[in-house]
């Protein structure tokens, strides 16, 4: 299943009222949105029809989130759904997650693109192939180690995979407090240490299986006042049926 097809189904299942997209490019994923949307990209070239209430910012995500109130564009409402597809380097992906979670709610969903490189070359920090994921892939290992309370689901979409992250806690400072330590351990010079099980997609679930799972109802029906602990507990009880590839807390070589 193509990643855009999967993302379209995610929008349909959650019916978000607010959406954030980091990394717009030509706008193909942005075109899926039908709600109040904040889109960030310093060099977008949108070439498709957009059908949402859009606030488009030609800037970097770091600059955007450094503003006094990043939620002005949503009239103070946190992001219900976010798609992170910015600069394909671990430090940027990590900062984007930290900023996005801080402006989300416990019932929100964050989706990363480009988490399943098909070779060490494709995962290189310095791009030299036609298709490039960069070293975003270690974010799975980072979240499993530092934020084990989160529900994370790698999805085997075409062509470079997605990662769903839920059970968010906007008050968490764990990643920000350990930012330098995380990069010292998980950021590597090229060639990248991409495990064979990652190349073979053994860490990811089939897209349709994820779409058919029952955890979507937890996010869709959650109260705006639900606590992170409550959402995390409900998600864990639903997502356990997805099996070993989902939510494993073992170190799987994603960058450690």
Language model features with spans:
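A short alpha-helical cap/connector motif
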Residues: 1-83, 87-111, 115-256
